[in-house]
Amino acid sequence: MNHIETRLPLPIQPIDRWLRPFARFLHIEATSGLVLILCTVVALVAANSSWADSYLAFWHTDLTIAVGDIVFHHSLHHVINDGLMAVFFFVIGLEVKRELAHGSLSDLKQATLPIAAAIGGMIVPATLYLSMQYGQPGVQGWGIPMATDIAFVVGCLAILGSRVPHSLRVLLLSLAIVDDIGAILVIAIGYTESLDGRYLFLAAVAVGAVHFLSRIGVRRFPPYVIVGVLAWIALHESGIHATLIGVILGLMTPATPTLVPERFREYLHEKEHEFQPKEWSRRLHRAEVVREVQQLTRETVSPLEYLEVTLHPWTAYVIMPVFALANAGVLIEPANLSDSVAIAVVIGLVVGKPLGIALFSWLVIRLGVARLPSGLNWPILMSGSFLAGIGFTMALFIDGLAFGADGLDTAKTGVLVGSAISAIAGMGLLLWTLPKPTRQ
């Protein structure tokens, strides 16, 4: 006779609540990296085939939305880069808030190394780019080689498997999140040409309304969505890139649940008699109890965790691939590869990123304000730092801001080539420096 052993679930510890979102995040980013590669290949093939004109014309299809006297008339490409990407930036805001509240950036001593590494990984590439483009028209692209694409980095680490120490994954993820913060500041400060104070004031009022709704305990999402859309419109008209409203709202999202698990268990204990056969047999009563339990179950999850779990797959598998299809299509020509802008972007990503990360990491460790995490040594850290040169999503996004809506083909070529070299170099060096797998 088969013996089936039933085990009671162990109580959830605080560390589990912090690590489960992190593990889920890594899994989604690893698989979405493969989807991004596929979409990039499709975009490149389309842009270099006989369908190139149709491919470009499709993304420039005009869309018109009219609400009363307000008329929005933009291309599909603009809607993706300014509209859909606002959701992507909202999820970035949620990720940053999570790391600041519970993750690797919540402890300043632990966060010092990734923060310093990220700062070095932004300053050195931008400096190299500026030194190569000083006095030339391409100088405004200085922000392109500063960012790191988390999805591709995690995908590369996933290919290397269990040999990669957990501490390297955490360091690179934390570094990439700080990179995102830097890229957001670059977009807000470096690529805002003019400001309309009236619309900026309206955007601030809308953000204040979101804070007010949160303070008075509004838990339904539709009011926040409506006010968020109004804030997006106001910021769009103010001259600041509208996607930044996503980051602001993400950072404002509460990171703590309304109902702690202990109180939820007490509630279930109090309601235990409701589940007795006599009471449970009444249909209306049953539906009411189930609805109440469902509502309270939702209250045990913070709005931040709920929104991140809900939206992260959509950004990873829909928004970012669509963005790649709309932006990665570039005509592959020898002239693009030899252009000074493309070369500056490649040097910034392939040389500037690892050099800046290694230099600033060495500096803070030398000063004694940080130390290498367990499982890491200098060869592994320096090898992994090459993966941070995979710019892609944010780099292409900044390219569009620096050189117009469609971006500059030479800059896009530099992003694609530099990211590919960084991925190959990083994975190759890690294969060489990581401990060899033990044979069973």
UniProtKB/Swiss-Prot annotation:
Single Gene Ontology BP annotation: regulation of pH
Chain segments annotated as transmembrane: 25-45, 76-96, 112-132, 141-161, 170-190, 194-214, 225-245, 312-332, 345-365, 378-398, 414-434
GO CC annotation terms, alphabetical: plasma membrane
Gene3D superfamilies for the chain: Na+/H+ antiporter like domain
Protein origin, superkingdom: Bacteria
Disulfide bond found in the keyword field: no
InterPro entries from the UniProt entry: Na/H_antiporter_dom_sf, NhaA
Single Gene Ontology MF annotation: sodium:proton antiporter activity
Record field: catalytic activity: Na(+)(in) + 2 H(+)(out) = Na(+)(out) + 2 H(+)(in)
Membrane topology of the entry: Multi-pass membrane protein
UniProt xrefs under Pfam families: Na_H_antiport_1
Residues forming coiled coils: none
Keyword set, alphabetical order: Antiport, Cell inner membrane, Cell membrane, Ion transport, Membrane, Sodium, Sodium transport, Transmembrane, Transmembrane helix, Transport
Subcellular location: Cell inner membrane
Family of this protein: Belongs to the NhaA Na(+)/H(+) (TC 2.A.33) antiporter family.
UniProt function note: Na(+)/H(+) antiporter that extrudes sodium in exchange for external protons.
HAMAP family xrefs: NhaA (MF_01844)
NCBIfam families (alphabetical): NhaA
Name of protein: Na(+)/H(+) antiporter NhaA
Phylogenetic classification of the source organism: Bacteria, Pseudomonadati, Planctomycetota, Planctomycetia, Pirellulales
